[in-house]
From Swiss-Prot:
Record-given protein name: Homeobox protein Hox-A6
Functional summary from the UniProt entry: Sequence-specific transcription factor which is part of a developmental regulatory system that provides cells with specific positional identities on the anterior-posterior axis.
Chain intervals for the UniProt region annotation (Disordered): 210-229
One GO CC term on file: nucleus
Principal localisation: nucleus
Species of the source: Heterodontus francisci
Family of the protein in this entry: Belongs to the Antp homeobox family.
GO BP annotation list: anterior/posterior pattern specification
InterPro entries according to UniProt: Antp_homeobox, HD, HD_metazoa, Homeobox_antennapedia, Homeobox_Antennapedia_CS, Homeobox_CS, Homeodomain-like_sf
Motif Antp-type hexapeptide positions after renumbering to this chain: 132-137
Length: 229
């Protein structure tokens, strides 16, 4: 087995009086050195390898730089939007490009806002332009303020329960105090105005009925008197 390392047990003789120089060279060093561990005949090959390894190292360094550069470009493309790549670029026109992209984005969003505004205005116009027919009006609402087609307030309709309770109250009291009117309005889910108007109308109806009764009674009495004579 051949070895390129120097064996300390065997003396080594070099031509041209290099023995004294060989004794000064340490056999085992702390670092790796091809010139110290290889014979002189392999010095040229070692130099060639060393010279060949330098471009390899240079290529490796280039590859490392290329990898770093590629990762930097990839990071820039990932973490920055397209409009911000111009600001990341080393050229001085990046700021202007970023501003141009910013203004272009504003101009791009303005038509959308205008379209939404137009659509909302059209929806409001349609909402207000919807015709209201008489059959669509609610007349039985307690707080209704809907007027009829001739500008008059629509007639209030009462439920059967409300009419029955109001008739009972009118049978006992033809005139209500304000306190009693408020109590009835809260009990029947009506307003004071509606209670007041109903009692006014009911009194007018009662007077007409009494007037008719009085006239019929007087007429009947006159007829009896005439027959008695």
């Amino acid at each position: 087995m051949s070895s390129y390392f120097v064996n300390p047990t065997f003396p080594v003789s070099l031509p041209s009086g290099q023995d004294s120089f060989l004794g000064q060279i340490p056999l085992y060093t702390t670092g790796y050195d091809a010139l110290r561990h290889f014979p002189a005949s392999y010095g040229a090959a070692t130099l060639q390898d060393k010279s060949y390894s330098s471009p390899c190292y240079y290529q490796q360094s280039n590859s490392v730089i290329a990898c770093n550069r590629a990762s930097y470009d990839y990071g820039a493309s990932c973490f920055y939007p397209e409009k911000d790549l111009a600001s990341v670029s080393p050229s001085g026109s990046g700021k202007h490009r970023a501003q141009d992209d910013f203004f272009s984005s504003d101009q791009h969003y303005k038509p959308d806002c205008a379209q939404n505004k137009i659509l909302s205005e059209e929806g409001n116009d349609r909402k207000y332009s919807t015709p209201i027919y008489p059959w669509m009006q609610r007349m039985n609402s307690s707080s209704s303020s809907v007027f009829g087609p001739h500008g008059r307030r629509g007639r209030q309709t009462y439920t059967r329960f409300q009419t029955l309770e109001l008739e009972k109250e009118f049978h006992f009291n033809r005139y209500l105090t304000r306190r009693r009117r408020i109590e009835i309005a809260n009990a029947l889910c009506l307003t004071e105005r509606q209670i007041k108007i109903w009692f006014q109308n009911r009194r007018m109806k009662w007077k007409k009925e009494n007037k008719l009764l009085n006239t019929t009674e007087s007429n009947s009495e006159e007829a009896e008197d005439k027959t008695g004579e």
